[in-house]
A protein has these predicted regions:
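Structured functional modules or segments
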Residues: 8-84
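Flexible, non-catalytic peripheral segments of proteins
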Residues: 1-8
């Protein structure tokens, strides 16, 4: 059976999914599943047209899911991560 990488604490809670505000490439994923992130934390750095955009959570919480990896191409509205 595939071991879930989700923290059992947060497994049952439904979180907020953060979507890409614009299309581009995932330059860096700064956090791991289970990490605590605050509103000012750049969880993901998105690179679009040579500009880096920090994607921050709307509220503090724990990272439940990360939908992208470094180097991925994303379109506007694609899910990036989920926070609970």
């Amino acid at each position: 059976s595939k071991k879930s990488s989700v923290d059992p604490d947060i497994e049952d809670k439904s979180g907020t999914v953060i979507n890409a505000p614009l299309g581009g490439n995932i330059f860096k994923v700064e956090f791991n599943i289970g990490d605590t992130a605050n509103e000012e934390d750049a969880v993901i750095i998105l690179e679009a047209m040579k500009m880096e955009t920090a994607i921050k959570p709307p509220h503090a919480g724990k990272i439940k899911k990360i939908f992208v990896s470094q180097g991925d191409k994303v379109n506007p509205g694609d899910p990036l991560f989920e926070i609970v």
